[in-house]
């Protein structure tokens, strides 16, 4: 089932998006494809699947490692490839007056 342009416009209003006519047509197709995929998922028989609260069971969680301290770059090394720097800091164009 394809989404109408009017439905896309309504979704855009709810999402506070301003879309061009071309974007409305593009999103209509993309959203329709997503909804078709969701409809296919709704048809799956999941009665034998046990509900889960996580993607992995509690015993399958990845092992945690201890934090380790590693040497880092000096400020000079970190800024060596910068197009502009001031001392040991990156120099960037002012964007706020």
Curated annotation (Swiss-Prot):
InterPro entries: Asp/Glu-ADT_sf_sub_c (IPR036113), GatC (IPR003837). The keyword Protein biosynthesis applies. Allows the formation of correctly charged Asn-tRNA(Asn) or Gln-tRNA(Gln) through the transamidation of misacylated Asp-tRNA(Asn) or Glu-tRNA(Gln) in organisms which lack either or both of asparaginyl-tRNA or glutaminyl-tRNA synthetases. The reaction takes place in the presence of glutamine and ATP through an activated phospho-Asp-tRNA(Asn) or phospho-Glu-tRNA(Gln). It catalyses: L-glutamyl-tRNA(Gln) + L-glutamine + ATP + H2O = L-glutaminyl-tRNA(Gln) + L-glutamate + ADP + phosphate + H(+); L-aspartyl-tRNA(Asn) + L-glutamine + ATP + H2O = L-asparaginyl-tRNA(Asn) + L-glutamate + ADP + phosphate + 2 H(+). The lineage of its organism: Bacteria, Pseudomonadati, Myxococcota, Myxococcia, Myxococcales. Its EC number is 6.3.5.-. It comes from Anaeromyxobacter sp. (strain K). GO terms for biological process: glutaminyl-tRNAGln biosynthesis via transamidation; regulation of translational fidelity; translation. Pfam families: GatC (PF02686). It comes from the Bacteria. Heterotrimer of A, B and C subunits. SUPFAM superfamilies: Glu-tRNAGln amidotransferase C subunit (SSF141000). Keywords: ATP-binding, Ligase, Nucleotide-binding, Protein biosynthesis. This is Aspartyl/glutamyl-tRNA(Asn/Gln) amidotransferase subunit C. One of its GO terms (molecular function) is asparaginyl-tRNA synthase (glutamine-hydrolyzing) activity. Belongs to the GatC family.
């Amino acid at each position: 089932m394809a989404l109408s342009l009017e439905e896309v416009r309504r979704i855009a209003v709810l999402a506070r998006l301003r879309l061009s006519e071309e974007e409305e047509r593009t999103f209509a197709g993309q959203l329709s494809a997503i909804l078709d995929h969701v409809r296919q998922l709704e048809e799956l028989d999941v009665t034998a699947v046990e509900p889960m609260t996580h993607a992995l069971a509690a015993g399958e969680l990845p092992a945690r490692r201890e934090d380790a301290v590693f040497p880092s770059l000096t400020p000079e090394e970190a800024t060596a490839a910068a197009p502009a720097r001031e001392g040991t800091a990156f120099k960037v164009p002012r964007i706020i007056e």
